[in-house]
């Protein structure tokens, strides 16, 4: 029999700190644990929810489900002619992995430092920050295919990554459970400093190494984002919307200080934080939930609130942005 806990509290398993419970929860520390949990008779007929760090989820109420608490460890380094292949268990802490690879002389993940959550969640969201996305460092994932109950390896193309999206949020959402991730870190490392704020942070360092860039990213994120241990949050709550060059030019004509970033395909990514700030939401408190005073992209939970209240605020923000700018901003977290 698997290790099941009934009516298990999830407040410490979601970074918003919403006080909800799971019908059953099971700690998954190996692939054998995963198979045992899925084959347990108590799991029959129950929906399945996989939680890592709970840093990209909004829990709106108690879950009448089996919650798998992903805690599979592991770290190993392989080689390819032009790269190191780093494989980590899905339960490893993401920032811990970034720091470990740098400490072992394997640069490439430094721009993704201090992103909360676990390794297994990183491909689901195609995490990204300061000019780097996970897909640019990705080799493969190992996952359980629930249709066949066999473990499979999925490569870059199969994972269908796009901006904050992947196979695992679309057609494969209920099919695959990630147990390990393999990253490809080039031996020909070059710093990525195209993001203006990061470049300014390392000014004065003529040749910043990966550790210096990681430290700069940590400094920037620490200034802008609240610590979930102090204030409940999931980091950036909204995606930066993509618009055509024509739509961006129309907006720029009436808003000369609009913040936007050109994309390789000719479209533009608008800074959602700027849009929200211009609508007057930055620093707003709406009872136990609100908008962080230092970064309008971040929604916060001060305690005693609900996921439903947070989503109501998010909807209000999105509606206001659309009414003013004609652009719809979408949430990043998964809603359960």
Swiss-Prot record:
A Gene Ontology cellular-component term: cytosol
Pathway: Cell wall biogenesis; peptidoglycan biosynthesis
Gene3D superfamilies per record: 3.30.465.10, UDP-N-acetylenolpyruvoylglucosamine reductase, C-terminal domain (3.90.78.10), Uridine Diphospho-n-acetylenolpyruvylglucosamine Reductase, domain 2 (3.30.43.10)
Catalysed conversion reaction: UDP-N-acetyl-alpha-D-muramate + NADP(+) = UDP-N-acetyl-3-O-(1-carboxyvinyl)-alpha-D-glucosamine + NADPH + H(+)
Localization: Cytoplasm
Cofactor needs: FAD
Enzyme Commission number(s) of this protein: 1.3.1.98
Residues forming the catalytic site: 164, 236, 332
GO biological process: cell division; cell wall organization; peptidoglycan biosynthetic process; regulation of cell shape
Residue stretches making up the FAD-binding PCMH-type domain: 17-188
GO molecular function per UniProt: FAD binding; UDP-N-acetylmuramate dehydrogenase activity
Coiled-coil regions listed: none
Top-level class of the enzyme under EC nomenclature: oxidoreductase
Pfam families in alphabetical order: FAD_binding_4, MurB_C
Keyword Cell division annotated: yes
Role played: Cell wall formation.
Matching NCBIfam families: murB, PRK00046.1, PRK13903.1
Protein name (database record): UDP-N-acetylenolpyruvoylglucosamine reductase
Organism of origin: Cupriavidus pinatubonensis (strain JMP 134 / LMG 1197)
Lineage: Bacteria, Pseudomonadati, Pseudomonadota, Betaproteobacteria, Burkholderiales
Gene: murB
């Amino acid at each position: 029999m698997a290790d099941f806990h009934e009516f298990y509290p999830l407040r410490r398993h979601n970074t918003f700190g919403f006080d909800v419970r799971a019908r059953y929860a099971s700690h998954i520390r190996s692939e054998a644990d995963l198979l045992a949990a899925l084959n347990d008779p108590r799991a029959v007929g129950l929906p399945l929810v996989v939680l890592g760090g709970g840093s990209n989820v909004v829990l709106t109420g108690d879950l009448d489900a089996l919650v798998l608490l992903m805690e599979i460890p592991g770290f190993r380094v392989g080689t390819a002619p032009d790269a190191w292949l780093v494989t980590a268990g899905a339960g490893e802490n993401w920032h811990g992995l970034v720091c470990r690879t740098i400490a072992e002389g394997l640069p490439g993940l430094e721009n993704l430092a201090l992103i909360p959550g676990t390794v297994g969640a990183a491909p689901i969201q195609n995490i990204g920050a300061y000019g780097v996305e996970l897909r640019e460092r990705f080799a493969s994932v190992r996952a359980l295919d629930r249709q066949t109950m066999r473990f499979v390896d999925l490569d870059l193309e199969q994972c269908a990554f796009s901006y904050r999206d992947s196979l695992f949020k679309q057609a494969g959402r209920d099919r695959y459970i990630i147990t390990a991730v393999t990253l490809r870190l080039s031996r020909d490392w070059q710093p990525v400093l195209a993001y203006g704020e990061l470049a300014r942070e390392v000014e004065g360092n003529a040749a910043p190494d990966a550790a210096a860039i990681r430290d700069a990213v940590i400094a920037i994120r620490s200034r802008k984002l609240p610590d979930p241990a102090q204030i409940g949050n999931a980091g950036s709550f909204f995606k930066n919307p993509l618009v055509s060059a024509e739509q961006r030019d129309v907006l720029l004509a009436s808003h000369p200080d609009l913040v936007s970033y050109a994309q390789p395909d000719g479209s533009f990514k608008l800074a959602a934080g700027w849009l929200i700030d211009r609508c007057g939401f930055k620093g707003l408190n709406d009872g136990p939930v609100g908008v962080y005073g230092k970064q309008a992209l971040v929604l916060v939970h001060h305690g005693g609130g609900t996921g439903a209240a947070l989503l109501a605020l998010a909807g209000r923000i999105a509606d206001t942005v659309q009414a003013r700018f004609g652009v719809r901003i979408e949430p990043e977290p998964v809603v359960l």
